[in-house]
Amino acid sequence: MSGKSFERDSSGSRIGNETELIQTYLAPLAEGMAGAFGLTDDAAFLRPASGSDLVFSSDPIIAGVHFFHDDRPADIAWKALACNASDMAAKGAAPVAYLLTLALPEAPERDWIAAFADGLRAAQSEFGCKLIGGDTDVTPGPLSIGITIIGSVAAGAFIPRGGAKAGDHVFVSGTIGDAALGLALRRDPSQFSTLTDDQRALLLDRYLRPKPRLALAGPVRSYARSALDVSDGLIKDLRRLAGASLGIAVKFDDIPLSPPARAALAANPNVRDSILAGGDDYELLIAVAPENIGKFVTSAGESGIPVYDIGVLESKITTVVVDPSGVPIALRRPGYDHFSR
């Protein structure tokens, strides 16, 4: 990280150059990381613990795509780190450090970047990692926040996406659909006029501040054959878990829903599509061999995060969600796609 200049701001309320941005607001997030060098070098190093492998994942979030331009900066920062930390949980890994690439359309207000840094500080404290490096720059496009997260897992214990087998039971953590409904609420509050203030607040919180299921990393590492997080919609990510040779028929009534989601569904059955395909849940889908189900459920229970058995993977069937009559539910789209609008 080095010091590029921003356009001069006569009001004095905006950051004057990259050095100020980094050293005043971002460098404190790297305190205690020896390999970060206080964000004064062009590179950083990370020494893995003996007997462990490093795990890497990278997901950017972009204004107008993954968040609203006027979302609170602390919420934007939290979401940027949370969606990456979620990948660590699915791999059975613990977050250690992250790289931040911050592309700004203009020099940020000092109050804005201070709140953004506070959001990162809260998130990294919650997730157990620290900033180790990255870059900042000016872009002609919208605000873009790219994070590469680095985690650690016992050597050979990485949990792949493609390890599931026929007969494995699929578990899902938490509840599904809250974030998609929170997004719909953010766009048009009038759709959810029948919900209470507390119900609306929960849906918005699930959209703005996802909670990566890091407490499940241990049970996943010990007992899962395959796992991934639900980022692009339950149906789409179930198909990813199943792969080309497997499928699963999930009963809609077996999918865990929060009380606000159930209330929204009762008021408007059309939100079912959003629940199944909306994405941004950041819950975990976990394939467990039959002989490990008891141990997995016990271990997951000790984490404090609920998990639910939603079906069994089978050979040569299509992945679908079925209604109470056993009829597959037709969706307008199976999930989120970055290149489909």
Positions of the model-derived regions?
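Small-aliphatic-rich amphipathic alpha-helix that forms the alpha element of a beta-alpha
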Residues: P73-A97, D118-E126, A215, P219, ...
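Residue-level signal for inorganic ion chemistry
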Residues: F45, N84, G92, L131, ...
